[in-house]
Amino acid sequence: MRNTITTLTLCLLAVPAFAKPKNEVVVPLKTGTGEDAGTATFQQEKGKLSIKLNLKNLPVGEHAVHIHAKALCEAPDFKTAAAHFNPENKQHGKLNPMGHHAGDLPQNVTIGEGHTGQATFKVDYLSLDPASPNSIIANGGTAIVVHEKPDDMKTDPSGNSGDRIACGVITT
């Protein structure tokens, strides 16, 4: 009887853990040579998705960061991540009057002389909720990609942002 009560209690305690949607995902990024490029932390908070980048071992300068459609990051070029995450079939760029890809983040990230950089974005057009049409974790997930150049925020399809230099798979 005691074992039955203990088992039932443990089961009841486990139910909320399974029922609660994931509100944070930490993604490690790698360079094309397999070097640690830092992390991206995604946190769902009050209808917005916070994306916190803590990057390292990247070239000094401005770099575009995008969410790409496939949860694949095969080095060295990361082309397996496919095109930008774009469930609404829009064009590229925050400055595009017709709207932008869901994978377009609102600004570039600066990598300083120490080859590190941090940035935080809050967006209302991406979600960790797997039931959301703009979920970055549904259907197997997506990828976060750092590019060699800054995004000009208007040129379709990728803002003239150049090659992909770091990548991380976004899944739960």
Briefly describe each language-model feature range:
Residues 11-18:
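Hydrophobic h-region of N-terminal signal peptides that target proteins for export
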Residues 18-62, 67-172:
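N-terminal leader/targeting pre-sequences
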